[in-house]
Amino acid sequence: MSPSDVPINWKRNLTVTWLGCFLTGAAFSLVMPFLPLYVEQLGVTGHSALNMWSGLVFSITFLFSAIASPFWGGLADRKGRKIMLLRSALGMAIVMLLMGMAQNIWQFLILRALLGLLGGFIPNANALIATQVPRHKSGWALGTLSTGGVSGALLGPLAGGLLADHYGLRPVFFITASVLFICFLLTFFFIRENFLPVSKKEMLHVREVVASLKNPRLVLSLFVTTLIIQVATGSIAPILTLYVRELAGNVSNIAFISGMIASVPGVAALLSAPRLGKLGDRIGPEKILIVALIISVLLLIPMSFVQTPWQLALLRFLLGAADGALLPAVQTLLVYNSTNQIAGRIFSYNQSFRDIGNVTGPLMGAAISASYGFRAVFCVTAGVVLFNAIYSWNSLRRRRLAIE
């Protein structure tokens, strides 16, 4: 029996990668609550300058991640996914350590860019599990895996705020580096992968990758869906606290209310993703995707008409439950329409589209709210998601007709 034929305990790998995604999600979000404060501590003064630099250090990570993801995806298809997980966890740990030592804003900006270049733990974890799990359990497995990053992202800001209050800003970066190093150790000792390295000559080029896809047009539509999901999520982020303040009026605990309303979609996604993923394995992920997109539209529109923060919280909870199905459904359809040989690149391309959405979403939300007010953001976002639902339905219908 060759090494590549030795059975893999994919359930153990799923558990360990879930922990890795949880730690990575927590590590990234640990520093988010005080990022503008750290920018100020590095010598940036003035309201407009602080806003500009805070936006730059936030977005540059996603921009460089979008650029680097296809390269790392190709390397994963050549060398294996485990080594990419190790490279990502250790690289991010070192960069986080250096961030805590930054002396000026330019050093910090460069390190944030480097963080984007060296990232990629979660897409590589998705690719690893997608190539190991039985096809009929892909939806459940990828849905479960997605809850790891969501859980970490939910707990990270809370933990980061508490740590910053008790120990100061710089020590949080050192703690974050330690968390990422633990992720590296877990991956090194407990994840197993049977992978036969592929020479550069044997690697499929981009045209061959496209030719090997069962339905290239559908795969492109799935990439666009990923982008729009992130645009829809990100467009609301810049205005959420201000919108909650407008709804709540003069209350003393506006930060708490805003934080709770910001986090409820994540809690709902945490509960819904594995269950809807399992349902998708039974009835088809394409049905889950279209229904979840339509429900998202129907929930976004009334958000522009709410009168109290609690009405907004309820709608965002329901939206989170629907959104919890979206990315796992996209990833499952990518698994169905590609081969293990190119899984690393397909998931990395998907990550690039996700990163572009992470950058453009907040810009779109800020621009719309500046011109037309907070409530218009929800209506425009609903329109974008509706377009995506129609586009995705049309792509999936063409695929079904082609099969028939």
Swiss-Prot record:
<feature type="transmembrane region" description="Helical">
    <location>
        <begin position="144"/>
        <end position="164"/>
    </location>
</feature>
<feature type="transmembrane region" description="Helical">
    <location>
        <begin position="222"/>
        <end position="242"/>
    </location>
</feature>
<dbReference type="Pfam" id="PF00083">
    <property type="entry name" value="Sugar_tr"/>
</dbReference>
<keyword id="KW-1133">Transmembrane helix</keyword>
<dbReference type="InterPro" id="IPR036259">
    <property type="entry name" value="MFS_trans_sf"/>
</dbReference>
<keyword id="KW-0812">Transmembrane</keyword>
<dbReference type="InterPro" id="IPR001958">
    <property type="entry name" value="Tet-R_TetA/multi-R_MdtG-like"/>
</dbReference>
<dbReference type="GO" id="GO:0005886">
    <property type="term" value="C:plasma membrane"/>
</dbReference>
<comment type="similarity">
    <text>Belongs to the major facilitator superfamily. DHA1 family. MdtG (TC 2.A.1.2.20) subfamily.</text>
</comment>
<keyword id="KW-1003">Cell membrane</keyword>
<dbReference type="InterPro" id="IPR050497">
    <property type="entry name" value="MFS_MdtG_subfamily"/>
</dbReference>
<feature type="transmembrane region" description="Helical">
    <location>
        <begin position="317"/>
        <end position="337"/>
    </location>
</feature>
<feature type="transmembrane region" description="Helical">
    <location>
        <begin position="171"/>
        <end position="191"/>
    </location>
</feature>
<protein>
    <recommendedName>
        <fullName>Multidrug resistance protein MdtG</fullName>
    </recommendedName>
</protein>
<dbReference type="InterPro" id="IPR011701">
    <property type="entry name" value="MFS"/>
</dbReference>
<feature type="transmembrane region" description="Helical">
    <location>
        <begin position="376"/>
        <end position="396"/>
    </location>
</feature>
<feature type="transmembrane region" description="Helical">
    <location>
        <begin position="90"/>
        <end position="110"/>
    </location>
</feature>
<keyword id="KW-0472">Membrane</keyword>
<dbReference type="InterPro" id="IPR023692">
    <property type="entry name" value="Mutidrug-R_MdtG"/>
</dbReference>
<dbReference type="InterPro" id="IPR020846">
    <property type="entry name" value="MFS_dom"/>
</dbReference>
<keyword id="KW-0813">Transport</keyword>
<dbReference type="GO" id="GO:0022857">
    <property type="term" value="F:transmembrane transporter activity"/>
</dbReference>
<dbReference type="Pfam" id="PF07690">
    <property type="entry name" value="MFS_1"/>
</dbReference>
<feature type="transmembrane region" description="Helical">
    <location>
        <begin position="254"/>
        <end position="274"/>
    </location>
</feature>
<feature type="transmembrane region" description="Helical">
    <location>
        <begin position="19"/>
        <end position="39"/>
    </location>
</feature>
<feature type="transmembrane region" description="Helical">
    <location>
        <begin position="288"/>
        <end position="308"/>
    </location>
</feature>
<keyword id="KW-0997">Cell inner membrane</keyword>
<feature type="transmembrane region" description="Helical">
    <location>
        <begin position="113"/>
        <end position="133"/>
    </location>
</feature>
<feature type="transmembrane region" description="Helical">
    <location>
        <begin position="56"/>
        <end position="76"/>
    </location>
</feature>
<dbReference type="InterPro" id="IPR005828">
    <property type="entry name" value="MFS_sugar_transport-like"/>
</dbReference>
